[in-house]
Amino acid sequence: MEHSRFLSCLILAALLSQVNPRILKVLEPEDKVMLECNSSITLLQGTEGQEVSGNNKTRDLGKRIQDPRGMYRCGENTQQLILQVYYRMCQNCVELDTATLAGMIITDIIATVLLALGVYCFAGHETGRFSRAADTQALMGNDQLYQPLRERNDAQYSRLGDKWARNK
């Protein structure tokens, strides 16, 4: 039992001796992105941002929606921490994996089949049967373009043209 405690204390001491005293944190207050270090922050590449405190220990990288990104160094000597920040705020993105793609293809096929079935049902069959008499038409003679109107004297305006002779 004592050997396991001694071994665990030895492992803990070995790990703690490797800890770097510089701490580089990424803070996200509200909709902003900020870097905080216990020593100075140096920009290697990317979004520069603005110093929040005058001692260069806190840097405001801007809003998350503006996709801040870059590489930053905490410290100035050989024992330094480098942090790469990369934000990607995608408002209109859809993750297209195999399940989503298969679902889109299957729903497209189902919609096409239903549309074809609907067109077949409505346009493929006649709505009713007509009698044979309705298929034949009373045809006029070849010389006649228009069928003459019948004589009627039952309306108010039928007597207006009594003085003029009608061609019969």
From Swiss-Prot:
Residues 135-163 form the ITAM domain. Residues 1-21 form the signal peptide. The keyword Nucleotidyltransferase does not apply. CD3D is mostly present on T-lymphocytes with its TCR-CD3 partners. Present also in fetal NK-cells. GO terms for biological process: adaptive immune response; cell surface receptor signaling pathway; positive thymic T cell selection. Disulfide bonds join 37-74. This is T-cell surface glycoprotein CD3 delta chain. It comes from Bos taurus. SUPFAM superfamilies: Immunoglobulin (SSF48726).
